[in-house]
Regions:
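A conserved structural motif in NAD(P)-dependent oxidoreductases
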Residues: 208-219, 230
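Short, small/polar-rich loop/turn modules that mediate ligand/substrate recognition or access, typified
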Residues: 172, 177, 234-236
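A short, exposed helix-loop element centered on a Lys and neighboring polar residues
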Residues: 122-123, 165
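A glycine/serine/threonine-rich, flexible loop-to-helix segment
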Residues: 101, 149, 173, 183-208, ...
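Catalytic loop of short-chain dehydrogenase/reductase
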Residues: 91-93, 136-160, 164-173, 185-186
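Substrate-binding pocket helix/loop in short-chain dehydrogenase/reductase
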Residues: 97-99, 103-108, 204
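Short C-terminal tail/terminal secondary-structure segment
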Residues: 96, 207-210, 223-224, 235-248
Length: 248
């Protein structure tokens, strides 16, 4: 990825963090977006990117706001000197036993973060993406096998998988590839901050053939490969990493 310029949302932790560090190690300059309250984690990622000798740009802000999403892309392009990799990774996941427990405000928060934000960011980025550029979306095995307590989150991941395939057909003729990563049970802050019940956490990932949850670093190479030029025939694909579970 030498000389490539990447923007990653949710780059402060979990899979976004792992992808950002891996991109830097492969020679890319990286801009990460994150919620302002995650500044300490984000600054750690920035230092790790710089330690690889690459340019690192921190762009805090709330991607539920369309104007900010436009500013995010503009800042990334200006600071990096261009853009050719967009990783739409930020997500909101909250466990609710019943649909009756989800307020309209909570539902809207999930939709804005997981669906609206990629729409706004990709629209803003497209004028800057030249042939050979790549868009990567983080979906989930929840797109194929939704949990009953992740009603809102799971449907956003099904939508993510769908827009990956739709955009791949739309942008392929322009030389822009669009692919996705569908993680299974990966140990990230999403799980321990309300994304899973305490009961689930006790055996999180235990149902997979590998018998354990995955770590974000175990997915990083997928994000690298999908961004690499030698993956030039991968378009509209969703790559799974779920310890033997899941369908992709």
């Amino acid at each position: 990825l030498k000389g490539r310029k990447a923007l990653i949302t949710g780059g402060d932790s979990g899979m976004g963090r792992a992808a950002a560090i891996a991109y830097a190690r492969e020679g890319a300059d990286v801009a990460i977006n994150y919620f302002p309250t995650e500044e300490p984690d984000a600054l750690e990622v920035i230092e790790l990117i710089k330690a690889e000798g690459r340019k690192a740009i921190a762009i805090p802000g709330d991607i539920r706001d369309e104007d900010f999403c436009k500013k995010l892309v503009e800042t990334a392009v200006n600071e990096l000197g261009g853009l050719d990799i967009v990783v739409s990774n930020a997500g909101r996941q909250q466990s609710h036993a019943s649909i009756l427990d989800i307020s309209t405000e909570q539902f809207d928060w999930t939709m804005k973060t997981n669906i609206y934000a990629p729409f706004w960011i990709i629209k803003a980025a497209l004028p800057h993406l030249k042939p050979g550029s790549v868009i990567i979306g983080t979906t989930s095995e929840q797109a194929y096998d939704p949990s009953p307590d992740l009603y809102d989150y799971a449907q956003t991941k099904a939508a993510t998988m769908n827009y990956i395939k739709s955009l791949a057909k739309q942008l392929g003729p322009k030389g822009i590839r669009v692919n996705g990563v569908a993680p299974g049970p990966i140990w990230t802050p999403l799980q321990v901050s309300g994304g899973a019940t305490q009961k689930k956490l006790k055996n999180f990932g235990g149902q997979t053939p590998l018998g354990r949850p995955g770590q974000p670093a175990e997915l990083a190479s997928i994000y690298v490969q999908l961004a690499a030029d030698d993956a030039s025939y991968a378009n509209g694909q969703v790559y799974g990493s779920a310890g033997g579970s899941g369908q992709p």
